[in-house]
Swiss-Prot record:
One Pfam family matching this protein: DUF480
Record family assignment: Belongs to the UPF0502 family.
Entry protein name: UPF0502 protein Oter_3715
Gene3D superfamilies for this protein: Winged helix-like DNA-binding domain superfamily/Winged helix DNA-binding domain (1.10.10.10)
SUPFAM superfamilies: Winged helix' DNA-binding domain (SSF46785)
PANTHER family reported in the protein's UniProt record: UPF0502 PROTEIN YCEH
């Protein structure tokens, strides 16, 4: 699917700078840049080849992708248009490298950047998953400590950067998602309806009937087997 590098924006009241809406490729490229800055700063900024590898790595990524250099370059161009990435050409390096302006653009602290980085690279996460998966970037002392960071991002001005999704059926925790891919529609975020309760007695009766049928079939098969030797 072709990716557009034309900046898309969400409409906000006059006077506010629009929140950029990132494509899937831009989300992955930005997440990879942020992650490598926090976890391996000695190799940051990244060359194009290193950035391609960071986008395509199979660990800590959901979904797993296989971008080529042209795709990643388009993502970089889009991020640069949205003032979220830059080209670095140091005096001691002949190779062009790339960095991000994520924290500066949204005035974020390290804890906030770590949370958003995981959401960019892995999609919606529960608070427990976020605390576990941000460990290399920022060590949250407790789950309440993480919850405070999530709350701060959800109340960020002028535009929230994360939101909580309705609890899924069968899950104890709600999930958190970033809003840099656009706002979450209410209809798609509505929780699935609860399944009707199962009558336990009826279920047991059905299980017993199925076992009896299997036993009858086994008896018939054994009887046929015995006749071969009579």
């Amino acid at each position: 699917m072709a990716e557009s590098t034309t900046p898309e924006v969400v409409a906000y009241p006059a006077g506010d700078e629009p929140l950029p809406v990132l494509s899937e490729v831009e989300v992955r490229v930005l997440g990879a840049l942020v992650e490598k800055q926090l976890t391996t700063p000695e190799y940051y900024p990244l060359t194009l080849n290193a950035l391609v590898n960071a986008c395509n790595q199979t660990s800590s990524r959901d979904p797993i992708v296989s971008y080529d250099e042209a795709t990643v370059t388009r993502g970089l161009d889009g991020l640069r248009d949205k003032k979220l990435a830059y080209v670095f050409a140091g005096a001691e390096s002949r190779v062009v490298k790339f960095g991000h302006k994520f924290a500066e653009r949204f005035e974020l602290g390290r804890a906030e950047v770590a949370v958003l980085c995981v959401l960019l690279l892995r999609g919606p996460q529960t608070p427990g998953e976020l605390r576990s998966r941000t460990g290399r970037m920022h060590a949250f002392e407790s789950l309440p400590d993480l919850e405070q960071t999530i709350a701060a991002l959800a109340a960020k001005q002028p535009h929230p950067l994360v939101t909580r999704l309705p609890r899924q059926t069968g899950f104890k925790e709600v999930r958190v998602t970033h809003l840099l891919g656009g706002s979450v529609s209410v209809s798609s975020a509505e929780p699935a309806p609860e399944p009707p309760p199962v009558d336990r007695t009826m279920q047991l009766d059905q299980d017993v009937a199925a076992l009896r049928q299997e036993l009858a079939e086994l008896r018939e098969q054994f009887a046929a087997f015995r006749k071969q030797f009579e």
